[in-house]
């Protein structure tokens, strides 16, 4: 599968639409949620989150939960401890009133999460063994000879699209306006604790 955190790249073009038509939080978190079944199971197995039914009863409620956790618990401390090159670009989002925004735009947020999750499933359908397009497009079931090894086309698409998606996200972040007044302090203890929790999990 493509790397989970490359998935938001596919929804970024939607940010060129009028601002009131979409929720960036909803699109980005929605594009990530289908892979959270892997994290919850602690193994690469998904019975629900990559299905049409799962969009509504797994991805949508989980996406809403993650959005509230991120904006109310994670966001400010994370942004405060980012390296300056990132902090200076994300500082504008620190004062965002998510709870108020959601009350006024709950339908837009909901639809954005569903669109984000659907985009994830669409992308994976080209790169999973049992993906819809892998099963219906014979060329995706072929292999390519590389240095004497047979590499499946879907693996090439997996890694190639992951790299391309990552580059798109890096470029999008680079193009964000910067705040030159951000201090350069980084709390190493914060990152040590975060790394410890990640390794523990």
Language-model-derived ranges and their functions:
Residues 1-201:
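N-terminal membrane-targeting hydrophobic helices
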């Amino acid at each position: 599968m493509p790397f989970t955190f490359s998935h938001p790249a596919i929804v970024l073009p939607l940010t060129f639409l009028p601002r009131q038509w979409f929720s960036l939080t909803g699109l980005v978190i929605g594009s990530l949620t289908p892979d959270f079944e892997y994290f919850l199971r602690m193994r690469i197995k998904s019975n629900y989150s990559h299905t049409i039914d799962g969009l509504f009863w797994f991805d949508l409620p989980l996406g809403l939960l993650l959005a509230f956790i991120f904006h109310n618990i994670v966001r400010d401390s994370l942004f405060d401890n980012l390296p300056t090159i990132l902090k200076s670009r994300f500082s504008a989002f620190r004062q965002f009133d998510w709870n108020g925004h959601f009350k006024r735009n709950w339908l837009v947020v909901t639809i954005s999460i569903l669109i984000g999750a659907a985009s994830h499933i669409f992308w994976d359908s080209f790169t999973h063994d049992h993906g819809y397009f892998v099963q219906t497009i014979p060329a995706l079931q072929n292999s390519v000879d590389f240095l004497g090894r047979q590499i499946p086309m879907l693996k090439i698409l997996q890694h190639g699209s992951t790299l391309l998606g990552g580059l798109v996200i890096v470029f999008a972040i680079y193009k964000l306006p910067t705040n030159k007044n951000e201090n350069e302090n980084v709390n190493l203890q914060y990152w040590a604790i975060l790394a410890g929790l990640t390794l523990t999990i």
